[in-house]
Amino acid sequence: MRNAASVGLCVGLSALGAAANDILKPEADYRDFRHYQLNNGMHAIAVHHPRSNESGFAVAANTGSLYDPQDVPGLAHFLEHMLFLGTSKYPEPESYDSFLTESGGANNAYTDEEKTVFFNKVTDSSFEEALDRFSFKSPLFSRQYEEKEVNAIDAEHQKNIPNDDERAWYSIRSLAKGPMSRFATGNSSTLSTTPKAKGIDLVDRLKDFHTQYYCGSNMVAVTISPRSLDEQEALIREKFEGVSAGHADWLGMVQCPGPMFDTVKPFDESNTGKFIHLQSFSSEPSLWVAFGLPPTLTSYKKQPISVLTYLLEYTGQGSLAKRLRLLGLADGLSPVVDKNTVSTLLGIKVDLTQKGAAHRGLVLQEIFSYINFLRDHGVGHDLVSTLAQQSRIDFHTTQPSSSIMEEAAGLAHNLLTYEPYHAIAGDSLLIDADPRLTNQLLQQMSPSKAIIAFSDPQFTSKVEDFDTDPYYGVQFKVLDLPQHHAIAMAVLTATPNAFRMPPPLMHIPKASDLKILPGLFGLSAPELISDQGGNAGTAVWWQGQGAFALPRIAVQLTGNITKEKADLLSRTQGSVALAALAEYLQEETWISKTAG
C-alpha cells in the first residue's frame, strides 16, 4: 500500500448466527463481539458498543498492490480512489461525501500489498443509509473522474519522493523477484501516460480488476455500533448479500479467485549479497541491512519476527544499539518489517553519525557480530515467556479505541489475515512462547543473504556510472558484496564482553489474574504520601489510578530551581544536566517502557 493460490481467507470459520464473544477479546473490553458469514461467502464481525453514539464500519478486500497487472502499476490503489464516485443507486459522484458531511461522518481508505480497506463513521441515526451507500454494489467508475483521481494519486506519490526512508526501503524491495519489486503507489506515468501510449483503457482494466477480486468470499465487513448484534448482522446481510459471490467456473461452481500474482520466491542467492549505494535527500546518512526471510504470517501465534525485532532494538547492557553509540558510530537503530504471504522482509535501519558514515564497514562488522552472537547463544525460553506474559497483559488491559472507524479498519484487516478467533489480537498477542522458529530465522541472517543499502548525502560526489530510478528519481548504484567480505563477516566473533543476551523482561506482573481494586478512582486532589522536606526537597504524591485500569505505575520527576538561580546560564546548565541524566538512565527507562 501481495499466487494462483494464497493463504486461505478466514481459517476456522464459525457457523451462521454465532453466539456473542466467539472472538478472543481483552478482559478490559466491555463490548460484545460476533463473527458470522453471509450466504455469498463474505465474513463479518459485529461489535456492540453500548457507550458510543456513533457507528463505525469497514469493508476490506483480499487484494492490493501485489495484484497489480504488470503493465499498470498502481491499479489497485486507483480502484480504491474510484470505487465510491457514484453507484447505480446513488449516481452522483459527490453524493457519498456530501452524505457523510451532513451526517457528521468521516471516511478513509488504504491499499497495502495484499489488502484494500475502506472505513467510515457516522452518527448512529445515519448508520443504515451509510451501509446502503457503502455496500459495494454496481460502482460506475465514471471516466470523467479518471484524470482527477490519477492526479490525486500522483500528488500522494510526489509527497513520498523526498522521504529517505521510503526511497531506501523501495530500493531494497526493487531487487526482489516477482511483484514485490514493483512500484505500488502509481503515478501519472503508470496510470495515464504509459497506458495511453500502449492503447490500454484504464477504466476497462479497472472494471476487470474489480470483477475479479471484489466478490463475497474475498471480502469482509466489520460494524461497531450501539445497536444490538442481531440488528447489526441483519443490516449487513440486507446490504451486502447482493455483493457477487464470485464467478461460475466450467463445472458451474462459484469461484472467487484469490491472489493471482507470481509465487516465485522473492529473494535467493541471485539477488542477495548486494550493496546499494543511493542518494540521500537528507543531510543525515543511514545504513540499512535487510534479509528476505520465509513468510511468517501463518506463524503469528509464535511471533518470531516480534521476538527478533525485540532483540535488535534492545538498548540495555550489551546491546547492539549501545555498542554503536559507545563507538560513536550511530545515534539510533530501528527494525523495519514487511510481511506478506510469500516473504518476510526484515530490515535494520541505523541512523549513522558522520563517523559511522565514514566507517560503515565497521558498523556492518558490529551488526553481523551481534547477529552471530545471538545465533551462537540462541534465544532462550525464559525471555520469550516474559515477552508472552507482557503481550497478554497489554492485550487484556486494552480499552476500546477512541477512533471507532480506525478500530473497524483494524478488525477488517485482521479478519482477512488471521483466524476469526484472533481478529482482535492479530499479531499483538504472543500465544505460543516457543523460541525455535526465531532461532531458525537467525540461522538465515548471514551477510550472503543480506541486502545492504547506504543512504548517502554525498552520493553525487563519490559515485560514477549510477542509475536513476524512474519513479522516485533517486540516483543509485547496485554492487555485489565482495565474497571475501561476506565470508569474513559471517564468522565474525564479537569483541569480548561487547554483547550480552537480553535478559528476561523485568518489572512485569507475575500474576495472570490481575484484578482492579475498588476505590482507586476519582481522587479530588493528589494525596501527599511522603515528604522528606529539608534540604532533600523530595515529596511523593499519589493521584489515584487514573482513567484506565492498567497494571502499571507512572513516575514523574520534577525538579525546581530557586528564583535567584533562574538566570540563562543556570537554565542552560539544568537542561544539559537533565539531558545527561536521560542518557544515563536510557537503559533502565527503556526496560521499563518495554514493560508497558
UniProtKB/Swiss-Prot annotation:
PANTHER family: INSULIN-DEGRADING ENZYME-RELATED (PTHR43690:SF18), NARDILYSIN (PTHR43690). GO terms for molecular function: metal ion binding; metalloendopeptidase activity. InterPro entries: Metalloenz_LuxS/M16, Pept_M16_N, Pept_M16_Zn_BS, Peptidase_M16, Peptidase_M16_C, Peptidase_M16_M. The keyword Transit peptide does not apply. Gene3D superfamilies: Metalloenzyme, LuxS/M16 peptidase-like. GO terms for biological process: proteolysis. Its cofactor is Zn(2+). It is an enzyme of class 3 (hydrolase). This is Sporozoite developmental protein. Its EC number is 3.4.24.-. May be involved in the degradation of a protein which is a component of the signal transduction pathway regulating oocyst sporulation. The active site is at E80. Zn(2+) binds at H77, H81, E156. It comes from the Eukaryota.
